[in-house]
Amino acid sequence: MATNSFCTSNHILVGLGGTGGKILKAFKMRMFEEFPTQEERSKQPVALLYVDSTDEMMSKDGRARADFRVMGQDASFTNNEFLNIKAVDVEHILDHIDHYPSVKGIVENVGAVKSAIGSLGQAAGQKRRAGRLLFAANAVGYVNSLRDAYSRCINVSGDSSETTIHIFAGLSGGTGSGSIVDAIIQTRKAFPNAYISVYAMMPEMNLPKSDMDQGRYYQNGYAALNELNALQAGAWKPQDVTGGGEADYYSDRVKGVANGLTIYSNVNENGLTINSFTELPKVISDYLFARIFFVNDSDQVNSDIVRAYKYENMDDFALEYDEAGNPDPVTGRIPVARTKKVNSIGIKRVMYPELRVLKHITYTIGESVLYQFKYNNWRENQGFANEERNRDYRNDFINKENLANWMLDEEHLTLEKKILPSDSDFMAFNEYWHDKAINYAQDAKKADCPLNELDNIMGDSFANFFRDCGVENYYAGKEKAIPDMAKEIRHTVEAGFFEKWKDGDISITELQKISKLLIERVSEIRTELEATTKDEIEEYKAIDEDRKANLKEWSDLGILQRMVNVGERKYVRHQEYLTEFYTSKTRLVALEFAKKLAAKVFNELGKMDADISAFGMKINEAINETERLVTAQRKVNKGLEDMKGAIIEVSEDETMSEFEQELRCDKIEMPIIARQLRDCILPEEFVNFGRLAADISIDDITDAFDIKLSEIVKARHDEKADSDKKVLGLNILTQLQQKLRTDDDIKAFATKIVSQSGVFVQLNTDQIQLHLRNNEGNLSPTNPASINKKAILVSIPSPDDNPGLKKFADKLEAAFKNSFNQSTARTTITVNRKSLRKDELSIITVQYCFPIRAIDWMGDYKKRYERFLNTGNLATDQANAILLHSEGNGSQLPSLFARSDEEIKAAEEAYRVQQAAAQQPQAAQPYAQ
C-alpha cells in the first residue's frame, strides 16, 4: 500500500545519546516500512543526525545490522547521519584545556572537574558535565553535520523557507542529558529562523533494568530539567561553546531559545506503563511520523492539533514570573522564573496490522519453502512436511550408472577414460595393445623369431610410447595431478548434487544421506581395488606362462612347420597373448595409480560431505530464524479486549491462517515458489557447498523472503482471495464494524479507548491550580486559557463510498466527541474523516502550556537531587554538583518550584538590601510588563 505524504517542509531529526538514537532508529525503520523504495524515500525532505559518545548503534565493518533490517533492506544509520563525539577523550581535554578555548569557558576549576569526573569508559557514564565536555569539543563538528543534514533536505525540497529541527534526548544519562543545552543553543545559532522542537525523556520511576541507575539517574533528570527551564525562560545564558562569552540566543519572538519543550515518560496520564527501551521510542517515533507525514498543516480540520504542537496562541501565557521577584526600579519589570512552553504528547493507533499480516504469511510460506529445501517431502493437506521421507537411497543413487557418470568406476580411476577435461582421449587398454599387436605383426615376421620381435616391439611401446611416454612414466607423471583429478571428481559429483537440489528433485537432507553412502561406497571401491589388483596379478602370471609356453612351442617347431599353418597359428595366438599380457601389465600399473587416486577422492568427498552438512546447518539456522520471525509476527495484544497499549490491532488471524494453509498446500504453486526463492538466493555460479554455506547468510534468505516472497504472496493473494477472504488491503472501519455491532458497542469502544490513551506524562493537579504572586489575573489558573490545555485529533479513514460504512463512521465520530473529559484540562477534539491511512484509526493528543513544576514526578526528583547535593561533606557536594550540572553548580538557575511564603519574604528582604547596595542595574532579561 503506497503511503501518501503531506511533508512539504524540511525536517531534521537530531538524536542525542542512546535515547535519541533509539527514537531515530524507530523513525528510520518506519520510513523503510512506509516508503519501501529508495525512490519514495528520496522524495521526502527529511534528514537524520545521530550524536553519541559510542558507536554501538552503528554498523561494523560495513556490514548491515540485523536489528536495522526492514523487509530485506538495511535501514542502518549511514556515516553522514552519525557524529561520534568520543573522538576526543574528556581526560585529554582537561589535560590540554588551553587547546580547547570553547571548552575552557565551562570549566572554572580544571582540577575539581577532573577529580569529579574521573575516568570514563566508552561513553559519558551518566556524568552530565562529561557529556557536555564531549559535545563542546565537537560542537563545530555538530554544526557542520547539522548543516549537511539541512543541505540534504534542501536538495529534496528545493525550499529553504520552512525548516523544523527536532532534538531528542534522554535526561538521565551523560551524553544526551549533558549535551542537550548546547545542542539547542548551537542549533538556534546556526539556524536562527528554524522551528526548533525539543523532546526530553524524564527518568522512569520504575526502572526497566535494575542496573540503570548508577547513583545519578534521577538527579541528572532534575538538573537537566532545571537547566532547560532556565534556558527557555531566558534566565540563564550558558557559555557559547563555538564562540566567546555567553550564548544569548533567547528570542522574545519564540519565548525561548527553542520553540518549546516536549517532555514525556514511560507512563501516560491514565497510568499505562510501557517499556522505555522497546515501546516508548516507537511511540515518540509514531507521533513524529504522523506529525511530519500524515497531518496536513494546511487543512483546517487539523488546525487545533497543529496549534497545540507548535505552541501557537499562547504568547501571553508562555512564561511564569518569579513569585519572589520585585519590580525593577528602572523598568518596573518582574524577572521570569519558568517557561510554560512545555507540552507532552501521546498517540494511540487502532490499526489493521497489514504489514504484520503480510510478514506472517510471507514467513509461514518461507518456512514451508525451507522444509522443501531440507526434506522435499510433500504431503497432501500439509504441503512440504518438516520431516524426511523414506527412500532406498543406495539403490536409487549409488548405482553403476551414477558411479560411471561421477567418474568413480574403474575405467576412470585407472585413467582408461580421462578425468580432467584438458586431457586427451585415449584408446582403452585392450584396444591399444590389440592394435599394436596387429599393426606390428607383419614387420615382426621379418625377424628370425617374429614372436620375440613382436614382444620386443610391444615391450618398447610399454616402456616408451604408451600415451607418448610409456606406461610407468605416464602414471608416474599423472600422480602429480591426483589432487586435481580428485577435485574434478568431487566437482562432478557435487555439481550434479547441486543441480538436483536446485531443481527441487532432492533435498539437502537427502544429499547428506547420499553423500555419506557415496563415501561408504568409495571406501568399498578402495577395498575392491586391492582385491582386483591381487586377481590381476594372478591373471598376469597366468598370461605370462601362456606367452612363454607358446614361444617355446614355436621355437620347437621345425623350419617347414614354421612355414606352414602350424607356425602361423602359433604366431596369431602369440599376438593374442601379448595383447592380454601388456593389457594386464598396464592394468597393474593403472590399478596402483587408481588406489592412490581413490584415497584422495575419499578425502575430497569427505570434505564435500562436511560442506554439504555446513549448508544443511545453514538451512537449519534459516528454519530456526524463520520460525522466530513467524512467532514475532503473531498477534501480541488482545485487540479490542485490551486497549491499554499504544497500538491496538484489529484483525482476524483465523482468516490469515486459512489463506496460508491454502497456499502452502497448493501442489502446483509451492514448487514454483520454492524454485523462485532458490533462484533469488543462490549465486549465479556454483563452486561448492562450502562456498555456498559461507556466501549465503541467514539475512540473504530472510531478505529473499522480504523482497521476493512478499511480492509473490501479494500477487497470489490478489489472485486467490475472495472479497470476504481478503487479508491485505483492508479498511480498519470494516474491521471495527464487524466487532462493534451495536451503538452501545461503539460508545463503549470510544469511551474506553479515550480513557486509556493520553499523553505520556502525569500532571499534579495541585501544581496546576497553584496561584502565584506576580501571576495573578489573566495569568492565574482561574483563566482556563492560561494553563493546561489539550488538543485531540482523531483521524478516521474514508468509508470507501460504502453507505453502511459511512453510517458507522458517523456514529463513531459522535461517540468520540462525547467521550472526552473536559474537567482536568481545556480540551478541543477534532475528528478528521479524510485520513488517507486506510488501515488505521489514530488518536493524537497534545497537552500543553504548563510549567515543569506541574509534572507529578518532579517532587520526587527534587528530593533525590537535594539529598545528592547535601551529603554533609562540602567537597563531596561540590564534586556532585559538577557531575550533575553542565555548567556551574546549579545555584545560578531559578527555582523550578514555587517558593514558600517564608522564602518569598526572605527574598523580598534580600532584594531591598541588594537594591540599596547595587551600583549598576542588572542586564535586561525577559520581564513581565
Annotate each PLM feature.
Residues A2-G15, T19-F32, P36-T163, L171, ...:
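Terminal, contiguous helix-loop blocks that mediate binding/assembly
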Residues H166:
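Short acidic, glycine-rich surface-loop motifs adjacent to enzyme active sites
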Residues G170-S177:
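Short, glycine-rich nucleotide/cofactor-binding loops
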